[in-house]
């Protein structure tokens, strides 16, 4: 993500120390760093401090994220940070927006979002040729229900398996698992961790993996590629700071996506994919929704309209689902 210098340096409202809550993974810390960099551009004199939390999702590595009834998708990676906000221990919680449930807890709000990174999923494979060249029955790892359902729809022959852990852990497991052909990860997370994907390969611990973007094949998760800055609704001094680093175009897009998520009564484990494009004042939203019955085909829907009415566009998409 490229940070654009603000038009003017801002004097922050009176806040002694701006405490930033984050998970402790390398990706979460990188996203906290992007937040700190954006704040430093807007408020050079603002003092920030990190507070790291371990969430239930970080602890319970035995939970299957492909089984929503077992994982309990709502707040699996966010609740501990939200509780800290409600206790007033931190000023802001930094989240991968795709991890957030459709509803904020009472008293909390997504006050700002940083500029969105690329939203595509990528295939990380051991052999060249990409998605179409995967052999019949190839084993593919993912922890996402959305990715798993889209993969099975596109390639019913593939064997999709549970694949948990942080990015580095998953790459090490892939290198060591001769029987697994590849895994799926978000392009945004890989780039934020400093991986160079421009050559179509990924170098990690002396292993070269082949990379293929699945943009156009798989629709991303709601909020994928966006960093959400969540704060208390009753802290106007905090809101005033965060609003200065809010990225308007990203915020419009995620308002449409999260409204659709709310209408579907969904959490981050729901098998729904979305793609939102914003051109000027025109917003287009496309979605794919999978039934609990895996024998049924997915339903696709789309709508477009004024960027000033993201909720209306989401409602039009929702109305096309049975």
Model-derived regions: residue spans:
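Small-molecule-sensing regulatory modules
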Residues: 6, 13-61, 67-70, 78, ...
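Short, well-ordered beta-strand segments
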Residues: 19-21, 93, 111, 141, ...
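Short, well-structured alpha-helical segments in soluble
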Residues: 76-88, 176
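Extracytoplasmic loops/domains of multi-pass membrane proteins
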Residues: 83-86, 95, 100-103
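Short, Asp-centered acidic motifs that coordinate Mg2+ and/or phosphate
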Residues: 90-94, 181-182
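A conserved helix-loop-strand patch within extracytoplasmic ligand-binding domains
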Residues: 97-100, 106-157
């Amino acid at each position: 993500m490229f940070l654009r210098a603000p038009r003017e340096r801002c004097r922050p409202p009176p806040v002694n120390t701006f405490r930033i809550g984050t998970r402790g993974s390398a990706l979460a810390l990188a996203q906290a760093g992007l937040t700190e960099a954006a704040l430093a551009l807007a408020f050079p004199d603002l003092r920030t401090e990190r507070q790291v939390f371990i969430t239930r999702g970080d602890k319970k590595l035995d939970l299957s994220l492909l089984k929503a009834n077992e994982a309990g998708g709502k707040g699996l990676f966010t609740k501990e940070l939200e509780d800290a906000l409600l206790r007033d221990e931190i000023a802001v919680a930094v989240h991968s927006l795709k991890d957030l449930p459709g509803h904020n807890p009472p008293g909390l709000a997504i006050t700002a979002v940083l500029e969105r990174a690329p939203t595509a999923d990528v295939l990380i494979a051991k052999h060249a040729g990409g998605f179409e060249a995967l052999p019949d029955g190839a084993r593919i790892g993912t922890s996402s229900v959305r990715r798993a359902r889209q993969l099975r729809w596109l390639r019913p022959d593939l064997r999709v398996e549970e694949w948990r852990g942080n990015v580095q852990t998953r790459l090490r497991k892939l290198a060591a698992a001769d029987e697994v052909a590849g895994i799926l990860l978000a392009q945004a997370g890989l780039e934020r961790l400093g991986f160079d994907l421009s050559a179509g390969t990924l170098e990690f611990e002396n292993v070269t993996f082949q990379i293929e973007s699945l943009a156009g094949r798989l629709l991303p998760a709601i909020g994928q590629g966006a960093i959400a800055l969540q704060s208390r609704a009753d802290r106007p001094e905090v809101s005033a700071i965060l609003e200065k680093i809010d990225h308007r175009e990203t915020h419009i897009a995620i308002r449409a996506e999260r409204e659709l998520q709310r209408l579907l009564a969904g959490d981050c484990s729901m098998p729904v994919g979305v793609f939102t494009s914003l051109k000027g004042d025109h917003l287009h939203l496309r979605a794919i929704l999978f039934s609990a019955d895996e024998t049924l085909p997915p339903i696709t829907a789309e709508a477009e309209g004024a960027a000033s009415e993201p909720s209306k566009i989401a409602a039009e998409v929702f109305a096309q689902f049975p």
